[in-house]
UniProtKB/Swiss-Prot annotation:
Keyword set includes DNA repair: no
Highest taxon, organism lineage: Eukaryota
Name this protein carries in UniProt: UDP-glucuronosyltransferase 1A1
GO MF, one example: protein homodimerization activity
Pfam families: UDPGT
Catalyzed reactions: glucuronate acceptor + UDP-alpha-D-glucuronate = acceptor beta-D-glucuronoside + UDP + H(+); 17beta-estradiol + UDP-alpha-D-glucuronate = 17beta-estradiol 3-O-(beta-D-glucuronate) + UDP + H(+); 2-hydroxyestrone + UDP-alpha-D-glucuronate = 2-hydroxyestrone 3-O-(beta-D-glucuronate) + UDP + H(+); 2-hydroxy-17beta-estradiol + UDP-alpha-D-glucuronate = 2-hydroxy-17beta-estradiol 3-O-(beta-D-glucuronate) + UDP + H(+)
Glycosylated residues, chain numbering: 89, 297, 435
Signal peptide residues on this chain, from the entry's feature table: 1-29
Length: 535
């Protein structure tokens, strides 16, 4: 009886077993083309690529031969294309950018120098993009590969041109774009009354003068963006054989994976194809190496301070480095300072210089008391994920805005790296370490950030696969993309209704005037004629 019973059960299970063995896999293996941007942008994308490869997808990465960080990997195929510049040129550009942050020229001279540098650097990158797109053999090989989707960082829209040339759906992986290009390309509303512009140093609670400043910045910001991005429109027009603007390049993206969230950023409108994956770089913490474990253990009850200004800053002017070293020597904590420049002569015993440090792993250690950072988005999120209060020294780009957001939330103190003194840095460190409110605020942000139904990495992987499976996501694209500017703002409707109202008012006015003439004009003429007869 028992044997018969088990046989019956096996017969019932057999169809399901066959379905599992021979049926279609849950995740359709596809081919993904990746066109990343070098530097930290690439490093944050690596986790997504690795997960996709583990799910059976074939990943091909294309990059210039002059790339610094993009190298061969075990979970992707790297294909490099020639460009008209060398790796040394890219390195020199990054070093110069780091030095620019410590330039103490007058404001006007700094603006001119920054403008010239942006123009020079963007010309170099544009030349690399043009070299790729005119490489007929390389582009033909990409076309023959029949990719299911392209994953790229739209900060430089070369990947967008490649996607349109290959006619493949695109997934963007970014923090944000300058000049609100991301909002324009997604048709996302940006109310200037409570959404601060980049470099405005405003929060989302603005007074009248701050709102005036916000509007003026919105009007003027397109000048710099025209220098960087307009040439890509001309290049795309040549390659695609049709008139193309930068917005035309960016707007077809299926999904925008935004490396942000509303724990760091202020609440604002979003669109259906904008997916927030802030904190994706907060990977699983690893045990510290013996070297760093020894540093942490030797710090005693006071703990450690982690100090890094990012990979772009390799050297600091001697005077400023000595001011920083003096301030660090005044606190009881052990300071691990990632620095590759000349060793300051006044470096204290509690300060250890290292060429590299496992930043996320150190921030996750319970003995870490504070984090000195340049406020890059990666560092900010690692500070949030690990609940470490911050002393922020923003240098360029979106770092000023990141620092303002953390300061507004009471999670850190911001210093002007050009104007700060040793006393300022000492006081800032002692404030975030000894004032419990900073630790409480950053822990609250950390708790909010981690309270989510799905990890950012898994969410990013899901949406890339989604686009690969469905050949895009056109159902998430708003009809606003197909409207003219006057249709979008309903100016034609307003004009039509206004014309009707004015016409009705005009007709009513004419009718009233006619009625008045009939009622009062006739009597006046009769009386006048009667008087003339009596005389």
């Amino acid at each position: 009886m028992t044997v018969v019973c088990w046989s019956s059960r096996l017969l019932l299970l057999l169809p399901y077993l066959l379905l599992c063995v021979f049926g279609p896999s849950a995740s359709h293996a596809g081919r993904l083309l990746v066109f990343p941007m070098d530097g930290s942008h690439w490093l944050s994308m690596l986790g997504v690529i690795q997960q996709l490869q583990q799910k059976g997808h074939e990943v091909v990465v294309i990059a210039p031969e002059a790339s610094i960080h993009i190298k061969e990997g075990s979970f992707y195929t790297l294909r490099k294309f020639p460009v008209p510049f060398q790796k040394e040129n890219v390195t020199a550009t990054l070093v110069e950018l780091g030095r620019t942050a410590f330039n103490q020229d007058s404001f006007l001279l700094r603006v001119v120098k920054i403008y010239m540098k942006v123009k020079r650097d963007s010309s170099m990158l544009l030349a690399g993009c043009s070299h790729l797109l005119h490489n007929a053999e390389f582009m033909a090989s990409l076309e023959e590969s029949h990719f299911d989707a392209l994953l790229t960082d739209p900060f430089l829209p070369c990947g967008s041109i490649v996607a349109q040339y290959l006619t493949v759906p695109t997934v963007y992986f970014l923090n944000k774009l300058p000049c609100s290009l991301d909002s324009e390309a997604t048709q996302c509303p940006v109310p200037l009354s409570y959404v601060p512009k980049s470099l405005s140093f405003n929060s989302d609670r603005m007074n009248f003068l701050q709102r005036v400043k916000n509007v003026l910045l919105a009007v003027s910001e397109n000048f710099m963006c025209r220098v960087v991005y307009s040439p890509y429109g001309s290049l795309a027009t040549e390659i695609l054989q049709k008139e193309v603007t930068v917005q035309d390049l960016l707007s077809p993206a299926s999904i925008w994976l935004m490396r942000s969230d509303f724990v760091k950023d202020y609440p604002r409108p979003i669109m259906p194809n904008m997916v927030f994956i802030g904190g994706i770089n907060c990977l699983q913490k690893k045990p510290l190496s013996q070297e760093f474990e020894a540093y942490v253990n030797a710090s005693g009850e006071h703990g450690i301070v982690v100090f890094s200004l990012g990979s772009m800053v390799s050297e600091i002017p001697e005077k400023k480095a000595m001011e920083i070293a003096e301030a660090l020597g005044r606190i009881p904590q052990t300071v691990l300072w990632r620095y590759t420049g000349t060793r300051p002569s006044n470096l204290a015993k509690n300060t250890i210089l290292v060429k590299w440090l496992p930043q996320n792993d150190l921030l996750g250690h319970p003995k870490t008391r504070a984090f000195i950072t340049h406020s890059g988005s990666h560092g900010i999120y690692e500070g949030i994920c690990n609940g470490v209060p911050m002393v922020m020294m923003p240098l360029f780009g979106d770092q000023m805005d990141n620092a303002k957001r953390m300061e507004t939330r009471g999670a850190g103190v911001t210093l002007n790296v050009l104007e700060m003194t040793a006393d300022d840095l000492e006081n800032a460190l002692k404030t975030v370490i000894n004032n419990k409110s900073y630790k409480e605020n950053i822990m609250r942000l950390s708790s909010l950030h981690k309270d989510r139904p799905i990890e950012p990495l898994d969410l990013a992987v899901f949406w890339v696969e989604y686009v690969m499976r469905h050949k895009g996501a056109p159902h998430l694209r708003p009809a606003a993309h197909d409207l003219t500017w006057y249709q979008y703002h309903s100016l034609d409707v307003i004009g039509f209704l206004l014309a009707i109202v004015l016409t009705v008012v005009f007709i009513v006015f004419k009718c009233c005037a006619y009625g008045c003439r009939k009622c009062f004009g006739g009597k006046g003429r009769v009386k006048k004629s009667h008087k003339s007869k009596t005389h």
